[in-house]
A protein has these predicted regions:
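Peripheral/terminal regions associated with large enzymatic or DNA-binding modules
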Residues: 2-7, 60, 66-68, 104
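The DNA-recognition helices of helix-turn-helix-type DNA-binding domains
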Residues: 36, 47, 62, 73-76
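Short, charged recognition helix plus adjacent turn
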Residues: 71-107
Length: 107
């Protein structure tokens, strides 16, 4: 399956959807959430993942639910790995015991 576009790093979402519209600088975000400006810079430039620690801090600062930024990161990571394993995943079959159990519940 050919991908239409590359997955969007959650740092790009942070920058484009949360920081730029409100005129918020990387320094301001870092100061408010208590992390180094370098961490925010690396996140918005796609050089660093959003950890659970960063996700919780960002969620509080931007009034989002606790899982918002970690879900963005998880979705991004899955998309990257899905692309990387594109040739492998179709060759993995359901475990026989699971397939058997699924047949029993389908009846």
């Amino acid at each position: 399956m050919k991908k239409v576009h590359a997955p969007i790093h959650p740092g790009e979402v942070l920058l484009e959807e949360f920081m730029l519209p409100y005129g918020i600088s990387q320094y301001e975000v870092a100061k408010v959430i208590g992390v180094s400006p370098r961490r925010i810079n690396e996140i918005v430039h796609g050089k660093r993942s959003i950890t659970a620690d960063s996700a919780l801090r960002l969620a509080r600062a931007f009034s989002m639910n606790d899982a918002f930024f970690s879900n963005l990161q998880a979705d991004y990571d899955l998309a990257i790995e899905r692309d990387r394993l594109e040739a492998v995943l179709p060759n993995i079959s359901v475990l026989p015991a699971v397939a058997k159990a699924m047949l029993k519940t389908a009846v």
